[in-house]
Design a protein with these regions (language model features):
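Divalent metal-coordination and catalytic microenvironments
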Residues: 23, 33, 48, 62, ...
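Active-site HxH/HxHxD metal-binding segment of metal-dependent hydrolases
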Residues: 50-125
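Metallo-beta-lactamase
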Residues: 36-37, 139-140, 145-214
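Short catalytic-loop micro-motif centered on adjacent basic/acidic residues
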Residues: 30-33, 57-61, 134-135
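Accessory terminal helices/loops
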Residues: 191-193, 203-267
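Conserved beta-strand hairpin/beta-sheet module of binuclear metal-dependent hydrolase folds
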Residues: 2-50, 147-159
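Short acidic-hydrophobic surface loop/beta-edge motif
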Residues: 23, 123-128
Length: 267
């Protein structure tokens, strides 16, 4: 069986540090996620073209805009590529696209001008260049949170579940049950004993070892602890920033604590 190459393509802070993963084989290329802005999408196009491979597949691993707003640029450059996502992700994208455009209106010309609607992934795997990428994750409390597992290369493409060097985005998981389920998914991910791990959000050039799993889990546990012993979001935020003074993506701790404390709605 031919070997695959994996490359993480980082995005700037202004794009919430959202990564994409470029997978290449002897002939073809696959992208996992499509960038937050149109500029992100154009950068992905440049990277794919530099490989000289044919882009056949774009898997959108989650329904938040930083996972797919750049898809328009990718589709324009590679009109024959298939865009795929799970059924919950497709539903989420369709239901929230217009409201997310309004929420991120300050991005102006970086916003997409049309929706690229992914096809629903048939089954629970993607076969690329003869290699199976298994869809893992999801839970009763987190039905739309998946990751990809490639057994032959022992690779985890962690998507929305993994952060590295950043505050973890918890605004979309406002309940303790959801965050506990998230930790369970991380435990299952670690049990696979991966040797290459891609975080969905990370500081540029972070390592591709188990650290993203460890960091995300430790942060979620600390988040729960500080929520339990602080009176309001401001105090919880201060406590988390004191624990993790070096982390980026501070908007995540600001919004996450407010949502968890019931001081604002998000979604």
């Amino acid at each position: 069986m031919s070997a695959l190459d994996f490359e993480i393509i980082d995005a700037p802070d202004s794009s919430l540090n959202k990564t994409a993963v470029l997978v290449t084989g002897p002939n073809d290329a696959m992208l996992v996620d499509a960038g937050f802005t149109r500029s992100d999408g154009r950068r992905l196009v440049e990277r794919v073209r530099a490989t000289g491979k044919r882009l056949t597949t774009v898997f959108v691993s989650h329904g938040d805009p930083d996972f797919y707003f750049g898809a328009q640029e990718v589709q324009d450059a590679f009109p024959r590529a298939r865009f795929l996502a799970t059924a919950p992700t497709v539903e989420h994208i369709q239901e929230t696209f217009e409201s997310k455009l309004r929420a991120w209106s300050h991005l102006g010309p970086e916003l997409p001008t049309r929706l690229v609607r992914p096809e629903v992934l048939p089954g629970d795997e993607i076969v690329f260049e003869g290699h199976r990428f298994e869809l893992r994750g999801a839970d009763f409390h987190l039905p739309d949170r998946h990751y990809l597992w490639q057994h032959h290369h022992r690779a985890v493409l962690g998507g929305v579940l993994l952060f590295e060097g950043l505050h973890v985005w918890t605004a979309d998981t406002p309940t303790a049950a959801q965050r506990a389920a998230w930790i369970d998914l991380l435990d299952g991910m670690e049990a696979l004993r991966p040797t290459w791990v891609a975080a969905g959000h990370r500081v540029a050039d972070a390592p591709t070892d188990l650290n993203a799993i460890d960091h995300t889990r430790a942060y979620l546990r600390a988040f729960e602890t500080e929520l339990g012993r602080t009176a309001d979001a401001a105090a919880a935020k201060e406590a988390l920033e004191r624990r993790f003074p070096e982390l980026g993506l501070r908007i995540a701790v600001d919004l996450g604590t407010k949502v968890a404390k019931g001081e604002m709605a998000w979604g």
